[in-house]
Structures are given as structure tokens and as C-alpha cells.
Swiss-Prot record:
5-phospho-alpha-D-ribose 1-diphosphate binds at R79, R104, D131, P132, M133, L134, A135, T136, G137, G138, S139, D200. It comes from the Bacteria. The gene is upp. Binds 1 Mg(2+) ion per subunit. The magnesium is bound as Mg-PRPP. This is Uracil phosphoribosyltransferase.
Length: 209
């Protein structure tokens, strides 16, 4: 079973308060999501391998460490996942960015893939799937399916707020995928929204309804 990591860092929790607040405007909401994604990236990349290299400082020669050639790919689920990309790219500018677009079939209520664009070297990369909200878990599970069908081997899921129901779905369908969240909320309501949640992340990021 994949592990669930819930970040309790004070800076993250402070910023999530304002992400949740319905009075936070689009500009501030967008900046806060960006900042939380950056903070979460520190933890989600903790297991990146390092190797020694020789450099010369202004004072002397030194042996120091760099990331050992690990190739990373960021996969935002359209459209809300886009809000998390830049915050991570600030720390990992060499990461490639793919996209997965899904819509919900009105009859079956199941997610349907309508767009996928990935780096060409899928099998060589570790991927981080990005979505601010993990609600029912259907979209995240289908996005992970899309990656696996195209050869991805190492996948993590990174969300800002998650419902227990969504976590359960992803863990059952993808027991090899670890989930990283900034907050684990109480439940889903009858409309499929996370409670207390943060509303519709896509609308709040892009100022739409």
C-alpha cells in the first residue's frame, strides 16, 4: 500500500488558512498555492539521490554534492493543477512538464481522458502528479492510469487538500503510489466537495465560475 504523507509544517498550515478563506481574492489565492507547492516540494524530493563532485570555491578545492542525474516530470491535472507547477519549477527548473486533461462523463460520472502530452522519455522519469484537491479520487487515479499506460514506473501524487475518500480510492487502485498532502480534511459532502476544503480550486485560481 502506498504511503500517505501529511505535512504539518507551520508555514504550510499558515498559508492553507488563507487558501481556504472564501474572502481571499484570485491574485492572493494563486500566489498562496504557488508558495505552498514550493514548500511541499522540499519534502517530496527528500529521497532524491546525491553524488559527490569536485569544485573549487574562492578559497579552496572542495568535494560537495549534487542531485545524481535524476529526471523529474511534473504532471498537472488540467486545469487546477497548473497552479502548482511554477512553485515547483522555481526549485527544480530542469523538470519537464506534461499535462493530463480529464472531464467527467455526465452519465457515468467517471473521468474521461481528453488530452495527454508527456515528455518523450517517460520510462526514464520520476513523475509527480499535481492537483490542489483530492476529492473523490477518480481524476487522480485516472491521471495515474494515463501515465502507467504510457510506460511511467515511478509516480507520486501531490495535493494541497485531500478527503479520506479520495485517498482510499487512489491507494486501492494504485498501491504503489505515495500521496503527499498539505491537509487531510474531514469528508466529502453530498456534492462531492471536500469539507471544509477550499471550494473550486480551478475557479479560484483563474477567476472563473
Amino acid at each position: 500500500m502506498g504511503k500517505l504523507y501529511v505535512f504539518d509544517h507551520p508555514l504550510i498550515q499558515h498559508k492553507i488558512t488563507y487558501i481556504r478563506d472564501k474572502n481571499t481574492g484570485t491574485k492572493d489565492f494563486r500566489e498562496l498555492v504557488d508558495e505552498v507547492a514550493s514548500l511541499m516540494a522540499f519534502e517530496i524530493t527528500r529521497d532524491l539521490p546525491l553524488e559527490d563532485i569536485e569544485i573549487e570555491t574562492p578559497v579552496s578545492k572542495a568535494t560537495t554534492k549534487v542531485i545524481a542525474g535524476k529526471k523529474l516530470g511534473l504532471i498537472p491535472i488540467l486545469r487546477a493543477g497548473l497552479g502548482m507547477v511554477d512553485g515547483i519549477l522555481k526549485l527544480i527548473p530542469a523538470a519537464k512538464v506534461g499535462h493530463v486533461g480529464l472531464y467527467r462523463d455526465p452519465k457515468t460520472l467517471q473521468p474521461v481522458e481528453y488530452y495527454v502530452k508527456l515528455p518523450t522519455d517517460v520510462e526514464e522519469r520520476d513523475f509527480i502528479v499535481l492537483d490542489p484537491m483530492l476529492a473523490t479520487g477518480g481524476s487522480a487515479a485516472e491521471a495515474i492510469n494515463s501515465l502507467k499506460k504510457r510506460g511511467a514506473k515511478q509516480i507520486k501524487l501531490m495535493c494541497i487538500v485531500a478527503a479520506p475518500e479520495g485517498v482510499k480510492v487512489v491507494q486501492e487502485e494504485h498501491p504503489d503510489v505515495d500521496i503527499y498532502v498539505a491537509a487531510l480534511d474531514e469528508k466529502l459532502n453530498d456534492h462531492g466537495y471536500v469539507v471544509p476544503g477550499l471550494g473550486d480550486a480551478g475557479d479560484r485560481l483563474f477567476g472563473t465560475k
